[in-house]
């Protein structure tokens, strides 16, 4: 009788081990499969629309991936007309900006000082750390690409500059 009990115990241990192993495999496979896709947006497929209301009027936006308003990574293109100014503001998360076309001039600080602006031609990149006040100006039509992680906020240094409050 002891041999039968011992054999039954071994069978149960092996079955339980196989069940746990199968569960581990089942739980990891869907996650790995979800990570294996990509997003392609050809230049001629970029769809421009209104910019987020946190930007002054006149800007246009095209969401290439995700949404700045939602949890997770996003890629957003912004198109600014010549003579556009983004007043001093900050974000609670890092911002990564690449100049695609035109000329983007940017500086850090709580007041616009044109002498402090650093002109960035196409191909330039700037990292803006969370909490750092900054502002930007365009003298010609300009397109930039913003990469970040949402939800992404904009807080103007001077609340009177916030277009959402007008």
PLM features: residue spans?
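Glycine- and acidic-residue-biased ligand/ion/polar-headgroup-sensing regions
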Residues: 81-84, 91-111
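Short beta-strand His + acidic residue motifs that chelate non-heme Fe in jelly-roll/DSBH
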Residues: 86-88, 106-107, 128, 133-139
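Short acidic-glycine-tyrosine-enriched beta hairpin
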Residues: 110-130
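Double-stranded beta-helix
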Residues: 37-39, 115-118, 135-166
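N-terminal secretory signal peptides that target proteins for export/translocation
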Residues: 1-10
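Bacterial N-terminal signal peptides
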Residues: 11-25
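A short, N-terminal "cap"/entry segment at the start of jelly-roll beta-barrel domains
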Residues: 30-74, 159-166
């Amino acid at each position: 009788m002891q041999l039968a009990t011992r054999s039954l115990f071994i069978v149960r241990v092996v079955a339980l081990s196989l069940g746990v192993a199968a569960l581990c495999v089942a739980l990891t496979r869907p996650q790995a499969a979800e990570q294996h896709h990509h997003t392609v947006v050809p230049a001629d497929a970029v769809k421009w629309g209104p910019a987020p209301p946190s930007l002054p009027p006149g800007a246009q936006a095209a969401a290439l991936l995700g949404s700045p308003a939602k949890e997770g990574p996003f890629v957003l293109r912004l198109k600014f007309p010549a003579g556009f100014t983004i007043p001093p503001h900050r974000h609670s998360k890092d911002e990564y900006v690449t100049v695609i076309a035109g000329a983007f001039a940017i500086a850090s600080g709580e007041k616009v000082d044109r002498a402090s602006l650093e002109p960035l031609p196409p191909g330039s990149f700037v990292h803006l750390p969370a909490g750092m006040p900054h502002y930007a100006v365009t003298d010609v039509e300009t397109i930039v690409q913003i990469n970040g992680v949402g939800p992404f906020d904009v807080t103007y240094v001077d609340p009177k500059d916030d277009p959402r409050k007008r």
